[in-house]
């Protein structure tokens, strides 16, 4: 398998280094092979060259079987530039529409939640990953004045919501789970409930 590796920023490279060690250990155990293709996307590259994601990056990442990404966000880069220019661009370019987040309490691990055991904390969050506030819609007017206004729009299409819901049901069936709980801020985001 060809895996494009993006260490990124902050603790990202450190986390990715540990993930690569784990993948290396799986090679012989499962008789599989990995070819790691290192990519320098992130804040350091942006500060040096002004590049976020180039067409060459898209081609290289698109030819991989998988992308391993650490973290994006650099203290010397204004918030939003890297996140929109790298994370959101990659999500949209490769249609990575599902954010899948398992939540598991492992045996022997303490939790601040009262009287909870591993059988109580074992669920998966399925979240739409390319729309909503991730659509990147919004802007400023009267920038730098006392009348400055900033907007951030949440764009949600029926098709994106439907495929996210379908994914959740398929995941539930495939993994022998029994329950789906839809979660939304309906009191604040009333129009999203139209779908």
Language-model region placement:
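Glycine-rich phosphate/diphosphate-binding loops that line cofactor/substrate pockets in enzymes
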Residues: 165, 169-179
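N-terminal glycine-rich phosphate/adenylate-binding segment common to multiple enzyme folds
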Residues: 47-142, 146-151
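Conserved small/polar residues in nucleotide/adenosyl-binding loops
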Residues: 186-195
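Short glycine-rich or small-residue beta-strand-to-loop segments that form or flank ligand, phosphate
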Residues: 2-11, 68-73, 180-185
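N-terminal phosphate-binding or glycine-rich loops at protein starts, especially the Walker A/P-loop
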Residues: 1-36
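Buried hydrophobic positions in well-ordered alpha/beta secondary-structure cores of metabolic enzymes
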Residues: 9-12, 65, 126, 168
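Flexible, glycine/charged-enriched surface loops at secondary-structure junctions
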Residues: 31-37, 175-183
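N-terminal beta-loop-helix "entrance" segment that forms/cooperates
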Residues: 33-53
């Amino acid at each position: 398998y060809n895996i494009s590796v993006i260490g990124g920023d902050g603790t990202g490279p450190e986390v990715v280094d540990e993930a690569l060690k784990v993948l290396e250990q799986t090679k012989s155990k499962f008789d599989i092979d990995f070819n790691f293709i290192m990519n320098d996307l992130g804040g350091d590259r942006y500060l040096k060259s002004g590049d976020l994601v180039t067409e060459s990056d898209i081609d290289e990442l698109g030819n991989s079987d998988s992308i391993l990404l650490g973290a994006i966000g650099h203290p010397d880069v204004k918030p939003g530039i890297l996140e929109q220019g790298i994370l959101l661009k990659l999500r949209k370019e490769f249609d990575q529409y599902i954010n899948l987040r398992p939540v598991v309490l492992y045996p022997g691990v303490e939790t601040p939640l009262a009287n909870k055991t591993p059988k109580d904390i074992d669920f998966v969050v399925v979240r739409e990953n390319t729309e909503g506030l991730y659509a990147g819609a919004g802007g400023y007017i009267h920038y730098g004045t006392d009348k400055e206004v900033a907007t951030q729009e949440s764009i949600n299409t029926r098709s994106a919501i439907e495929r996210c819901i379908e994914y959740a049901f398929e995941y539930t069936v495939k993994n022998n789970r029994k329950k789906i709980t839809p979660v939304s801020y309906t009191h604040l985001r009333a129009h999203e409930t139209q779908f």
